[in-house]
Amino acid sequence: SYNGDYFYRKPRIDYALLNKYSSGVICLSACLGGVYAGCYWANREEGEEAVLQCMREVTERMVSILGDRWYGELQWNGVPEQHELNQYIIKIAKETGIKLVSTCDSHYPTPVAWTDRELYKRLGWLGRGKPEWLDMNLPTSVQELEYELYPKNGDQMWESYIKYSKEAGVDYDDDLVLQSIEESHRIAFDRIERFYPDDTVRLPDFVVPAGYTADDYLRRIASESLFSMLKQND
């Protein structure tokens, strides 16, 4: 349920809430927007030791909450910074003893859903200008994207590792990466209950009052909310 105290751009939890309800929870360090990545982005200009020290502090905190249910997450894509982050995570894992997993950063349940969404999202920028970070050379096919954000099996994960590590020119320990892929399998099959991604579209069912069309009522509540927020900011 919604709680305004746990909302920052999207629903979230803080460390206190995680600590309170951590029993049985398995956490990974996430993608280039994750907690280890935060250390990387904030400290990379200061050098390797600054990044690692921040990651040590994060690791100590997460392990104190989750124990062996905290994992360093490696990902395989064409983003150069991902491979820099991977190297830092591997170093922290060797130093602290946390286990590693390899993932696809699965934002979408199927390749088809990913394909449709990624192309729609990027080509959509053409009609309304682009943010500064977006390359002028917008992709026209999924082959031009630098990642595949959907679940893969073990063989596909290994193929992604080989492909993207070669493109990045980064030498990894094959045995270590293989173990991280196998660890993902162990979590999926041995540590959690079975579930299957549900890609059905779910839209909220809004009751439109009598005398309004859906568009009219949306316009009304949007206007009322805007004026309410403006008053709060006075």
Predicted regions located by residue number:
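Phosphodiester-processing cores and adjacent nucleic acid-binding clamps
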Residues: 1-234
